[in-house]
Amino acid sequence: MTRYSQPDALGQYGIYGGRYIPETLMQAVLELEQAYAEVKEDPAFRERMNDLLENYVGRQTPLYYAEHLTRTIGGAKIYLKREDLNHTGAHKINNTIGQALLAERMGKRKIVAETGAGQHGVATATVCALLDLECVIFMGEEDIRRQELNVFRMELLGAKVVSVTQGSRTLKDAVNEALRYWVKHVDDTHYLMGSVLGPHPFPEIVRDFQAVIGQETRTQILEKEGKLPEAIVACVGGGSNAIGMFHPFIDDEEVALYGIEAAGSGLETEKHAATMSKGEVGVLHGSMMYLLQDEHGQVTEAHSISAGLDYPGVGPEHSLLKDIGRVQYEAVTDQQALDALQLLCQKEGIIPALESAHAVAHAKELARGMQPEEVVVICLSGRGDKDVMTVRNALKGEA
C-alpha cells in the first residue's frame, strides 16, 4: 500500500491548498516555508518545544475511559482524549507554542492572529506573554459579544484586541482583517494562523504541531486496549484538532475517521456551517478548499451556536480526505450539540466546549450501533467554561 503523504512539493493536497496570495505576501510565505523546513531538522528546536509542551502546557493529556457515558449509551467503549486539560483549556496552544517559537527564530517580534471562539486568541496571547512578543488579535464584533470573557483574558495577557465590524463580523472577517494587517507589517510580523487554513505552508505547519494529539492517542489506546480504536470522532470548523487527531491514523484503514461539522439550525436551512455537506470548491484566504457559496460564487455566512465552528470553509487536507473517502464528514445541529453537552456534564462531570459537544453528539449515535468490545475515541478539543453563558441562554430559550 502507498503510504499517505501530503502535501506535494507545491503545497497542494490533490487540487486543494496552494498559495492564492498577493505578491506582497509571497516573500514572507516563502521565508516561513524555509524556516519551517530548517526547524523540522533541528533537534534543539524540537527539544525546546517538547519541554514547553510538557512543563508549560501540561502534556501528555489523558485518554480517559468514559465508563458512565459508555454504560448510559450502550454499545462501544467510549474514550475521551482530554485536550480540554491543556493550559488555556483547548488544543489551540499545541500550535501557538510551535509557531511562536518559529517566529522568534525568524527574528519576528510581533504576532498577529485571528480568533473566533477566542480560544486561539487566548492561546496566542498566552505564548506571546511567555516569549515577550507583541500581540495583536483580530476578532469579529459578533464573536466579541459571544465571548466577552475571552476578550478580557486576551487583554489581561497583554494583547491588543481589534474588533472587526465588516461582513458577518465573525471568524471569516477576522481572518480578512488580520491578513490585511500582515500585508502592511510583513517585515517584522508573523501571522500565527489558528487552523489548517491559509496558503501553504500554514495547513502543514498547523497539522504537524497538532499531530501530537493523534500520536499520544495511538500510544495510549494501544496501552489501554491492546489495539487501535474502531472509530475516532472529532469536530471540524477549520479542522485543526481533527487533522491533528486523524493524521497519525490515516494509513490505518481499519480505523474509521469521522469529522463532525455544525449543522446549526439544520442542513435544510441557510443557518449552518456544514461545508462538506453543502459546500462547493472555491478559494478563500489563500487556499483552495470546500466553501459555502451562493450561486454567484460569493462566500456565504456560516452559522453555529459554537463560535469556533462557524467558518464557511474547511482545511484543504480535509477537502482531499473527503474526496478520497478516508474521512466521513457528518453534521450535528445546535440542539444535538446542546443535548450531548448536558449528557457529558451529567454522566462524567465534564463540561465540554460547544465545538467538542458536536463530536460527542455524533459519537453517541455511532457507539450505540457498535459492539461492547469495540472502541470509539472522541477528541474532546476544549473545555466549556467559555460557553456557559451561551448554553444557559440557549437552554432558557428552550424552557
From Swiss-Prot:
<dbReference type="GO" id="GO:0004834">
    <property type="term" value="F:tryptophan synthase activity"/>
</dbReference>
<keyword id="KW-0663">Pyridoxal phosphate</keyword>
<dbReference type="InterPro" id="IPR006653">
    <property type="entry name" value="Trp_synth_b_CS"/>
</dbReference>
<comment type="similarity">
    <text>Belongs to the TrpB family.</text>
</comment>
<dbReference type="InterPro" id="IPR023026">
    <property type="entry name" value="Trp_synth_beta/beta-like"/>
</dbReference>
<keyword id="KW-0057">Aromatic amino acid biosynthesis</keyword>
<keyword id="KW-0028">Amino-acid biosynthesis</keyword>
<dbReference type="Pfam" id="PF00291">
    <property type="entry name" value="PALP"/>
</dbReference>
<dbReference type="InterPro" id="IPR006654">
    <property type="entry name" value="Trp_synth_beta"/>
</dbReference>
<dbReference type="InterPro" id="IPR001926">
    <property type="entry name" value="TrpB-like_PALP"/>
</dbReference>
<comment type="function">
    <text>The beta subunit is responsible for the synthesis of L-tryptophan from indole and L-serine.</text>
</comment>
<dbReference type="InterPro" id="IPR036052">
    <property type="entry name" value="TrpB-like_PALP_sf"/>
</dbReference>
<comment type="pathway">
    <text>Amino-acid biosynthesis; L-tryptophan biosynthesis; L-tryptophan from chorismate: step 5/5.</text>
</comment>
<keyword id="KW-0456">Lyase</keyword>
<comment type="subunit">
    <text>Tetramer of two alpha and two beta chains.</text>
</comment>
<dbReference type="GO" id="GO:0005737">
    <property type="term" value="C:cytoplasm"/>
</dbReference>
<feature type="modified residue" description="N6-(pyridoxal phosphate)lysine">
    <location>
        <position position="92"/>
    </location>
</feature>
<keyword id="KW-0822">Tryptophan biosynthesis</keyword>
<protein>
    <recommendedName>
        <fullName>Tryptophan synthase beta chain</fullName>
        <ecNumber>4.2.1.20</ecNumber>
    </recommendedName>
</protein>
